[in-house]
Amino acid sequence: ENKFDEFLMAYRYSASLVAPDSYIRYYLDSKMLRYYTKFFARKIRRSKDDIWRNERFKAMGEILKNIHPRLLNKSSRYSKKMIKAGLNGDLELAKKTVSRHLAKIKFKKILKNKNEMNKYLYRHKYINKPLEENTVMFETFMGKSYADSPKYIYEYLAKNYPGKYKFIWVLNDPKEKLPYEGKIVKRFTREYAYYLGVSKYFVFNIRQPLWFRKREEQVFLETWHGTPLKRLAFDQEEVTAASPTYKAQFYRQKQEWDYLIAPNKFSSDIFKSCFMYDGNMLETGYPRNDLLSLPNRDAIALELKKKLGIPLDKKTILYAPTWRDDEYYGNGKYKFKLKLDLDLLKQQLGDEYVVLLRTHHYIADALDVTGLEEFAYNLSKYDDITEIYLISDICITDYSSVFFDYANLKRPMLFYTYDLDKYRDVLRGFYIDMETELPGPLVYTTEEVIDKIKNLNSLNQEYQQRYEQFYERFCSWEDGNAAMRVVEAVFK
C-alpha cells in the first residue's frame, strides 16, 4: 500500500530535476501514464480500500495536469478517457471506463482460448440451466483413469439401479471402454463444462476445478484417494511444488464437499483436521477396496494375470513408490529415478518371481525396463491399481498410501525407504511412526529387499502381531460392502 506514495514521491522528485520538454521528462511521464492506466485503474475498480477512489484518485488528477501534451495526444482511446476522468475528478467515468476496458480484455481472452470460453459458458449459461436430477458425473485423477472409488460406486449404481441414472465419466482417452451405459467426456471441454453446470451428483476422488461453483441443489461426494500417511493440506507447514495459494484454494474447494469418505477411524479424524472439514463424513470404508474382499477374488486374479500377460507359474512382486515433493518439473508433475536395482533382483529372484512396477499418477517420468522383458512389467499406465493388488504376492512400497489398501489382503509387505530421514524430517512428516507401526520391515538397499524376500517365512512370523494390529486399525471397516453403504447414504 505504501508503494503508491513512494511511486508518486519518486516521480515528483525526478521530474523536478529535468526540463519540462526534455526527453527524460517525456520518458518519466510515459511511465506515469502507463502506471495510471494499467495498474492504478484496476485499483479504482477492484480494491476494497476506498483510499484508491478518494485521496489517491485526487492525487493522480493533480499529476495528470503536468503530463507532457504529446503523450496525451498519442494515447489510446481508453487512455484518453481515463485521463479525462482523472483531470476532471470524475470517479464514475473512471470506474465505468475501467470496467468496459477489463471486460473487453476478458472477452478477447475468452475468444482466443477454448478453455476460457468453456468456463465463460459454464458461468453465464450452463449453471443457469435446469438441473438434470438423475445425472451423475464421475472423475478420477483429473480424467487420467477409470479407477478408484468412483469406479466402484458407478458400477454398483449401474448394476443395482439399471436405467435410473445417466452417468457421465470424465476421461481424457476417448478410446476408453466403459461397462454399462456411461458417457465419456474429456476434461475441460465444452461438454465437461456443461455437465458441471447441470449434473445433480458429482463423485470425484480429487478436488474439483477452482472455477466450479456448486449450486445449492447439487450434491458433491468427495471420495479422496487414500488413507493419509504423509501430512496433507493444512497439516503441511510448507507446500513445496504446488501453487503458492494451495491452502487458500483447498479451503474454498472443500467448502463445496457435501460428503467425504473415510476408509477407517484414523482417516476420519485426520481428514477433519487436515482438510478442516466439518461436513458429512461417511465412515464406510473405501468402495475401491470392495474388490479385495470378494469370495471369488482368486479367480478374478487369475483372469487378470492372463489379460496382462503375467506368467502364471511365477510369483509377483509389486513395487509401488510415491513421488518426492522436492523433485518436480512443475505443478503436479514429479520426477522419479528408480533406485531399486532391477537387474540384481532378476539375477537373484528371477527364477521364482516377476516384478510389477506401478508409479504414482503424479510421476511424469516413464520407467525404462529395456532388457528386463519377461521379468519387469511396467503397469504404471494400467487404470486400476486395486486389480494389481489382487495379482501381487508381495508389495514393496515407501511413503505411498497403497500399503493401507494392500493390507486388506494380509500379504507380505516391505518398505523400501532409502530416503526416510529426508522425507520424514524435511519434506512432509508422517501421521504414524513408520519405524514402530508398519506391518513390515523398513529396508534401505536392494540387497536387503532380496534378503527379506528370500526369508519370507521368518518375516511373516516376526511381523504377525503387528500386522494384525495394523489390520484392525486401518482395514476393519472394509468388508466388501463400502459402495453399497455410500450409495445408500448419498443417493437417497
Region spans (language model):
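A donor-sugar binding/catalytic signature common to diverse glycosyltransferases
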Residues: 202-231, 382-427
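Catalytic binding pocket for nucleotide-activated donors in carbohydrate/polymer assembly enzymes
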Residues: 370-374, 401-474
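Nucleotide-sugar donor-binding/catalytic module of glycosyltransferases
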Residues: 1-6, 405, 486
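Active-site and donor-binding regions of nucleotide-sugar-utilizing enzymes
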Residues: 135-295
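C-terminal subregions of glycosyltransferases and related glycan-biosynthesis enzymes
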Residues: 2-115, 159
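Conserved catalytic-core segment of nucleotide-activated headgroup transferases in glycan assembly
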Residues: 145-159, 274, 287-369, 443-445
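Donor nucleotide-activated moiety binding/catalytic core segment of transferases
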Residues: 185-201, 207, 361-404, 437
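C-terminal alpha-helical cap of glycosyltransferases
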Residues: 479-492
